[in-house]
Every structure is written in C-alpha cells, then in structure tokens.
C-alpha cells in the first residue's frame, strides 16, 4: 500500500507545524493507520533551522500525552513539494506567500491553507 505523504508548513518549524505533525501522527497511530501515512513538517523561512521545538509547544504536547521526538527545524525545498508530498498544509497566508517564493509559481492543488 502506498502511503499518503502529508507535510505541515509554518514559518519556522518550531511551533505550529511540528505540533500539527505530532498530533496527526498520534491520531493516525491511535487508529492503527500509521502504515498508511507519512507525516512530516518543515519551515518556509531559514531563521529557526536546526532549532528544537519551542519549549511551550513541547510542554503542551507533553501535557496532552502526545508523543514527540527530538525534532529539529528544517527548510522545505521546491523539489520536495513538487515531487514527494501528496498534500501540503500551510498554517497561514503569510506562510503561503513564502511558499510562493520558494516555488516560483502559484501553489498547485496539493497545497491547502489551514
């Protein structure tokens, strides 16, 4: 079975997108569907690259019992968007603007604004 590859994008990949990634992974795992999905997150800007999840975000995941790993912020690439992910969920309109700059064109149908 081919996995549906879902990517969450936000500004720095230290708060919203990794939280969405780990919440979605937990939801999928709780339903026994982890083999059906590949879930990831990334940033649309470079300023937080290499940084860990924002401590208050990490604390909230812990409080809610949502497992997370030693995530480090990373920058999305045009190639990943075009050739790898099936669905890209962008956190806000500003992130969509940055994504347009990365892609060099208007985002296609696999891009969704949350």
Please describe what each predicted stretch is.
Residues 1-84:
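Conserved active-site segments centered on acidic
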């Amino acid at each position: 079975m081919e996995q549906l590859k879902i990517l969450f994008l936000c500004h720095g990949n230290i708060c919203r997108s990794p939280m969405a990634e780990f919440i979605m992974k937990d939801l999928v795992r709780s339903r026994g569907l982890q083999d059906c999905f590949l879930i990831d997150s990334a940033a649309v800007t470079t300023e937080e690259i290499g940084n860990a999840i924002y401590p208050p975000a990490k604390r909230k995941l812990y409080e809610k019992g949502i497992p997370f790993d030693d995530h480090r912020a990373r920058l999305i690439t045009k190639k990943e968007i075009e050739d790898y992910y099936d669905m890209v969920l962008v956190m806000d309109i500003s992130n969509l603007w940055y994504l347009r700059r990365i892609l060099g064109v208007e985002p296609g149908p696999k891009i969704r604004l949350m």
